[in-house]
C-alpha cells in the first residue's frame, strides 16, 4: 500500500514538473496576444486621429453653396468647434478678399500628376488623395510657383491648408519680384515657429502650439499695402505695418519635407480685398458682397472664422439704428438647383438669426432670402468664378 502511495506521489510530481513549460508557454502566448492587441488598438487610434484631422473638405468643388475654403472644422484650444465671436475667435480679425483671382483644390488634377495649374520648379511632388481630399504631396524638398493672371493686388488675402507631422515639414512663400531675396517672406512651421522673415532674420514670428503639427493647419495671409498679417488657425503669428513684401504675377513656394514625413498642401485661394469699411461701401453702392461668412459643409451652421465679418455687420447695424438690410445667400451651379436654393435660403436665415441674438437687432430691420445659383456674378466654368459666386450679399433697404 505504501509502495502504491509512493508511486502515486512520484507520478503527480512528474506530471506537475512536465506541465510547467506548457503553463509558461500558455502564459507567454497570452502575453504576446495581449501585446499585439494593445499595439493594434494604438494603430487604430492613430489612424482615427489622422482621419479626424482630414475630415470635412469644405473647400472642394463638390457643393454649390457658399463654403469655407479650408479643410476641417474650426477648433478651439480644447479641440471642440466653437461659435463665431466665442473663445479664441473673439479677437480674430482676418477677412477673406471678395474677388477671387486664383483658386485650386486640385480636384481637376489627376492623382499622381503634378497639379495642372501650378508651375513646377524642382523636387518630388504629386497630387495625392488623402481621406477624400486631393493634396499636393511633397516627399522631399521642392519648389513650385502659383502663376497669377494679374499682379497680386495691394489689398489681398492668401489662404491654404497645410499638413506636416514633424519639424522637418516647413513652408516658405516669397513675393515673386526680381528683388524678392531682399524682401520679407512668409515662413511657416520652422521648428514650430511661424511668421515673417527676411535676410536679417525674423521680422515677427510666434511659436505655435505643438498640437498644430498634429492636425491640418489653416494658413492665411492678409496684406494692405505694406501692412502684412499672418495667421495659423485662430492665432495671428505676424502683425507687421511696414513689411517689404512685394507684388508680382507669381507666388514662389519652397517646401522642406522627408519621404517618411511628407508635406501636404491644398485649397489655395488668392483674392483681392480684405478688411474695409463696410458702412461706407453700403452707402455708396447700396450693397456689400462678402465671402467672409463661412458655413460648415452642407449646413447652415456658421463657422467661427466668420467672427470679424459678423462683428462688423452687427456693429454697423447697432451704430446706425435707421439702417435696414436684406441678407441674401448665393451659390454656384454645382449640385442640384433645388438643394442649392434651399441651402442658400437657410444660410441667409442663420445670419439673420445670429444678428438678432448676438447684437439684439430688431427683426423688422432684417430680411433674408436665398437665390441659389440664379444670380451669378461670374462664369461657373472656372474655379475662380465658382468661388466668386459663393457669397452672401447685404442689400440696403
Where are the regions that the model predicts?
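Glycine- and small hydrophobic-rich membrane-insertion segments that are intrinsically disordered
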Residues: 23-90
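Extracellular carbohydrate-recognition regions
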Residues: 74-118, 282, 286
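Carbohydrate-binding surfaces in secreted/extracellular proteins
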Residues: 106, 160, 213-241
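Extracellular beta-strand elements of beta-rich domains used
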Residues: 106, 268-270, 394
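Extracellular glycan-recognition surfaces and repeat-rich motifs
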Residues: 112-135
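Periplasmic peptidoglycan-binding/tethering modules of Gram-negative envelope proteins
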Residues: 123-128, 237-324, 357
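Secretory/extracellular carbohydrate-interaction modules
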Residues: 130-201, 209-210, 272-274
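Periplasmic OmpA-like peptidoglycan-binding domain that tethers envelope proteins to the cell wall
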Residues: 330-397
Amino acid at each position: 500500500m505504501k509502495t502504491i502511495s509512493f508511486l502515486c506521489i512520484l507520478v503527480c510530481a512528474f506530471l506537475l514538473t512536465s506541465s510547467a513549460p506548457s503553463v509558461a508557454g500558455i502564459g507567454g502566448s497570452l502575453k504576446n496576444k495581449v501585446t499585439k492587441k494593445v499595439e493594434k488598438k494604438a494603430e487604430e487610434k492613430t489612424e482615427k486621429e489622422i482621419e479626424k484631422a482630414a475630415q470635412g473638405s469644405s473647400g472642394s468643388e463638390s457643393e454649390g453653396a457658399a463654403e469655407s475654403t479650408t479643410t476641417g472644422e474650426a477648433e478651439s484650444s480644447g479641440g471642440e468647434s466653437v461659435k463665431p465671436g466665442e473663445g479664441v475667435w473673439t479677437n480674430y480679425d482676418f477677412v477673406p478678399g471678395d474677388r477671387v483671382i486664383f483658386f485650386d483644390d486640385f480636384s481637376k488634377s489627376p492623382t499622381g500628376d503634378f497639379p495642372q495649374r501650378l508651375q513646377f520648379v524642382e523636387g518630388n511632388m504629386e497630387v495625392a488623395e488623402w481621406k477624400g481630399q486631393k493634396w499636393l504631396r511633397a516627399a522631399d524638398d521642392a519648389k513650385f510657383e502659383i502663376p497669377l493672371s494679374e499682379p497680386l493686388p495691394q489689398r489681398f488675402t492668401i489662404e491654404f491648408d497645410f499638413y506636416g507631422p514633424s519639424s522637418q515639414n516647413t513652408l516658405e512663400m516669397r513675393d515673386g519680384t526680381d528683388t524678392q531675396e531682399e524682401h520679407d517672406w512668409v515662413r511657416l512651421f520652422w521648428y514650430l515657429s511661424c511668421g515673417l522673415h527676411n535676410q536679417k532674420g525674423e521680422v515677427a514670428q510666434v511659436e505655435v502650439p505643438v498640437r498644430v503639427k498634429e492636425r491640418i493647419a489653416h494658413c492665411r495671409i492678409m496684406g494692405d499695402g505694406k501692412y502684412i498679417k499672418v495667421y495659423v488657425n485662430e492665432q495671428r503669428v505676424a502683425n507687421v505695418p511696414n513689411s517689404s513684401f512685394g507684388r508680382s504675377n507669381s507666388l514662389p513656394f519652397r517646401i522642406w519635407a522627408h519621404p517618411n514625413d511628407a508635406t501636404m498642401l491644398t485649397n489655395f485661394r488668392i483674392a483681392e480685398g480684405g478688411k474695409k469699411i463696410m458702412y461706407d461701401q453700403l452707402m455708396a453702392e447700396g450693397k456689400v458682397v462678402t465671402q467672409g461668412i463661412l458655413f460648415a459643409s452642407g449646413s447652415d451652421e456658421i463657422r467661427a472664422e466668420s467672427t470679424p465679418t459678423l462683428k462688423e455687420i452687427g456693429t454697423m447695424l447697432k451704430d446706425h439704428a435707421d439702417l435696414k438690410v436684406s441678407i441674401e445667400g448665393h451659390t454656384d451651379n454645382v449640385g442640384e438647383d433645388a438643394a442649392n436654393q434651399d441651402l442658400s435660403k437657410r444660410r441667409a436665415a442663420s445670419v439673420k438669426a445670429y444678428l438678432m441674438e448676438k447684437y439684439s437687432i430688431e427683426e423688422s430691420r432684417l430680411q433674408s432670402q436665398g437665390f441659389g445659383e440664379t444670380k451669378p456674378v461670374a462664369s461657373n466654368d472656372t474655379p475662380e468664378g465658382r468661388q466668386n459666386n459663393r457669397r452672401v450679399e447685404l442689400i440696403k433697404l
